[in-house]
């Protein structure tokens, strides 16, 4: 074959490869996304906020694609118009009036038309604080149909829901921002990590959960922490456990250098002050504080190999301080959990963390003061900030922004 012919073939191959690449870079409509998760949700009612951190993270992610709020936070955490196009106040600044977005259709086919095309809220707080609270998914607009069905305005609607087991979301063809790329989302709930990994390997799933600390993402969205649920431990014993933990070794060996060591509930990128919550390991001081400590039952997810190894290491560290933490069934004294950071607004994120901790919370405090109050008494001991982990099939694009997810070539 002549050299010119070879050059022509090479050029043609490169051209067609470029065309294919450009075509693949354009989102395509259609297809079903198959999602498996560990969380088991009873419903998507925004009024029912779960205290279980796994369920809280899943519900906070799914609610906004079915139900929408008057405002939403952008990538920088700033409130932006959503179902409300604008807002104003009365002369006394005691009442705020929100103008409803026109031409918004509910999932049941009816138009969303609030009385006088506006909604009012009596509230004399600064508008910035009101907007940030309204942006929480738990403050979504929900319409109750006569049969009790909850109807929203989001880019997806619920086509089928089996509490705690499975669900199907289908595209809202009449969404005011245009329909999503996917035709539907099939969700399997309550799946353990082993089954999820097997389904991903066999091509039965597109999105699954993965063990903690396996993501290389730089931005951290979850906080690994110890939570004390019973009164068996005193503040001194809880502080002793905090002082006994060798976070440097855990991060280097068990987390393979991933994540950030921190004693704050919120990551540095969100709050800007997490470095203020800092203390050094002090086993000698921990032994003094731990004198007379009773044995504590300790719970963590044994299906997650990384979480299990961290739990075992924490028990060893506590033993060095003279505290016994042994695995227990049922209601444990101590839990090792991943607490989700559900919002780009500090106070909104802390409010949801307070739900996980089952602790009262004041939305009017400054973020630092609110976080300091949650940390007082060592009822929660933050350990690491880690990225949220998923396994994705090769055909998934734009995850986890579900309204913009599309199916490409594997």
Where are the language model's segments positioned?
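N-terminal lobe/hinge region of extracytoplasmic solute-binding protein
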Residues: 36-91, 151
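Periplasmic-binding protein-like
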Residues: 231-270, 310, 366-379
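Long beta-strand-rich cores associated with HINT superfamily self-processing modules
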Residues: 157, 390-410
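Ligand/substrate-recognition segments at binding pockets and active sites
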Residues: 289-342
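Surface-exposed binding/hinge segments that line
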Residues: 28, 95, 99, 108-149, ...
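Gly/Pro-rich hinge or "lid" segments in bacterial periplasmic/extracellular proteins
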Residues: 133-180, 184, 191-195, 284
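Structural transition elements
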Residues: 236, 256, 260-292, 302-309
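Ligand-site clamp/hinge motif
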Residues: 173-217, 221
């Amino acid at each position: 074959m002549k050299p010119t012919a070879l050059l022509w073939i090479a050029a043609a191959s490169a051209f067609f490869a470029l065309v294919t690449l450009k075509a693949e870079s354009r989102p395509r409509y259609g297809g079903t996304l198959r999602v498996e998760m560990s969380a088991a949700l009873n419903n998507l009612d925004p009024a029912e906020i779960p205290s279980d951190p796994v369920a809280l993270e899943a519900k906070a992610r799914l609610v906004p694609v079915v139900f929408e709020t008057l405002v939403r936070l952008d990538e920088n955490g700033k409130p932006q118009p959503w179902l409300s196009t604008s807002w104003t106040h009365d002369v006394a600044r005691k009442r705020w009036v929100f103008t409803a977005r026109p031409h918004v259709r509910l999932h049941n086919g009816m138009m969303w038309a609030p009385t006088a095309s506006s909604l009012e809220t009596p509230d004399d707080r600064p508008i910035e604080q009101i907007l940030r609270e309204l942006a929480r998914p738990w403050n979504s607009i929900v319409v109750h149909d006569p049969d009790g069905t909850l109807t929203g305005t989001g880019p997806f609607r619920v086509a089928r829901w089996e509490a705690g087991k499975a669900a199907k979301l289908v595209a809202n063809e009449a969404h005011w921002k245009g329909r999503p790329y996917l035709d539907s989302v099939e969700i399997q709930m309550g799946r353990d990590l082993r089954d999820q990994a097997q389904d991903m390997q066999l091509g039965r799933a597109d999105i699954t959960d993965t063990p903690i600390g396996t993501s290389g993402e730089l931005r951290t969205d979850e906080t690994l922490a110890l939570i004390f649920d019973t009164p068996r431990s005193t503040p001194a014993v809880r502080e002793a456990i905090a002082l006994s933990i060798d976070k440097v070794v855990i991060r280097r060996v068990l987390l393979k250098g991933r994540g950030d060591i921190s004693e704050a509930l919120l990551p540095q990128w969100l709050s800007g002050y997490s470095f203020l919550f800092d203390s050094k390991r002090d086993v000698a001081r921990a032994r003094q504080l731990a004198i007379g400590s009773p044995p504590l039952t300790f719970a963590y997810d044994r299906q997650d190999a990384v979480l299990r190894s961290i739990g075992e290491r924490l028990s060893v560290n506590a033993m060095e301080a003279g505290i016994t933490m042994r695995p227990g069934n049922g209601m444990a004294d101590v839990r090792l959990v991943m607490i989700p950071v559900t919002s780009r607004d500090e106070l909104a994120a802390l409010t949801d963390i307070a739900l996980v901790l089952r602790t009262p919370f004041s939305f009017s405090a400054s973020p630092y003061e609110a976080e300091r109050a949650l940390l007082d008494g060592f009822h929660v001991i933050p350990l690491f900030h880690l990225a949220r982990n998923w396994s994705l099939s090769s055909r998934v694009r734009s995850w986890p922004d579900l309204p913009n997810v599309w199916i490409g070539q594997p």
